[in-house]
Amino acid sequence: MKTKIGLLIVMLALLISCQQSSAPSLAFHKKGMIKVTIFYPNGEGKTFDMDYYINKHMPLVQRVYGNALKGLTIDKGIGGGSPDTPAPYMAIGHLYFENVAAYEEGLKKNRETFAADFPKYTNVMPVVQISEVIR
């Protein structure tokens, strides 16, 4: 009986440790990297197809940049800073690169590809900011 309980405890510990290690890590950014943030402003008459953005546009971005793109995250605006106020942005995309040149090289080669894809998911002119990751 003690052997069976001991074996059960070992099996449970292995199962739990496997589940914890299989979770994807979002720690792909580090100090000194470049973060390109794409803001999609909210407002009357503005539209944004989050499904298309997630399932079509961002995979396109990943294919274009390949290994130069170190990671990405997507935010969906759900509210403003005060209760019952709309989000200032419908969506925000964050792209991480080792340096500005890695971002600019892919953009120069594929600017038209990205521009042609914008109308498929939004009628908004995005606002882009390039930042250095500090922490």
Which residues fall in each region the model found?
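Bacterial Sec-dependent N-terminal signal peptides
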Residues: M1-L26
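Macromolecular interaction modules
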Residues: C18-R135
